[in-house]
Amino acid sequence: MMAGCGETDHSINMLPTNRKANESCSNTAPSLTVPECAICLQTCVHPVSLPCKHVFCYLCVKGASWLGKRCALCRQEIPEDFLDRPTLLSPELKAASRGNGEYAWYYEGRNGWWQYDERTSRELEDAFSKGKKSTEMLIAGFLYVADLENMVQYRRNEHGRRRKIKRDIIDIPKKGVAGLRLDCDANTVNLARESSADGADSVPAQSGASVQSSSVRPLTSVDGQLTSPATPSPDVGTSLEDSFAHLQLGGDSIAERSHRGEGEEEHESPSSGRVPAPDTSIEETESDASSDSEDVSALVAQHSLTQQRLLVPNPSQTVSDRSVAAGGIVSVRSRRPDGQCTVTEV
């Protein structure tokens, strides 16, 4: 009984100790379990969580988004507004902006200065304390050169684009840390990020009419006149009719002669406005008609041929009139004994 009570008392006395141990573990867990970045293979600086729940450094995610806009592990797409509104795992931004020492390193931005992240600041301070003229920094997957004599930074493979840097006290007004704004709660508009991985400012997207609607079809120019593609130009229609007139010239003349009768002269009325054909054409037509009238069998055959030619439509305004008026071309019609017509141009 005593042993049992002693064991029971011992187990009871151990409970607070275990509870205290659990409490101490829970309190020290955030400081011990610092997430590691799978991109830079170091402990995360300003860790952020993507929608896929993978954790990286903010600058590492920024560099990866410029290259592929996908998660480095699962290849899930990174949202467009993630860099403007990242999901920080710990509210350490303002504490990081205060720093641990008296001085901090800054790089130039629009209307203000950005503070370097802690890791890059340590590298710059170490190079500055050793009296180096320059040092290289790996930021968001890009190699940058910090010129400590001229106090500028630039990409190692792009010397033309330079940004001023400075070493100043920790309490100066600043925009944020490594591209993370201190006023994250402020209302921000959708911004078009420029191609800068070191925490550069964003450029507002131009809301002008730079993108035109592609639903409106452009106007086409025909003979110096703007016309819609759906509306044919009258000049184009006239030229098509003129070219088509040469093909139907023989058929229209045959239909007109069938109305007048065989052997009748083809003098046109003044209202038609057609240029009369040369005398050679009339003489050939009359001689052929007289020879056909002497042969009765030929007349019967010609009459049947005329009945077939009556089926050819005769428009209200013959296209031959427009062809003669527009081009000034006089065609000579002649009829062969076999009833076929030929068209020759003079």
From Swiss-Prot:
Pathway(s) annotated for this protein in UniProt: Protein modification; protein ubiquitination
SMART domains in alphabetical order: RING, WWE
WWE domain ranges (all copies): 91-167
Top enzyme category: transferase
Swiss-Prot/TrEMBL keywords: Cytoplasm, Metal-binding, Transferase, Ubl conjugation, Ubl conjugation pathway, Wnt signaling pathway, Zinc, Zinc-finger
Cysteines joined through disulfide linkages: none
Record-level GO BP terms: positive regulation of canonical Wnt signaling pathway; protein autoubiquitination; protein K48-linked ubiquitination; ubiquitin-dependent protein catabolic process; Wnt signaling pathway
E.C. designation(s): 2.3.2.27
Domain notes: The WWE domain mediates non-covalent poly(ADP-ribose)-binding.
Subunit structure of this chain's protein: Interacts with poly-ADP-ribosylated AXIN1, AXIN2, BLZF1 and CASC3.
Protein name, entry field: E3 ubiquitin-protein ligase RNF146-A
Lineage, highest ranks first: Eukaryota, Metazoa, Chordata, Craniata, Vertebrata
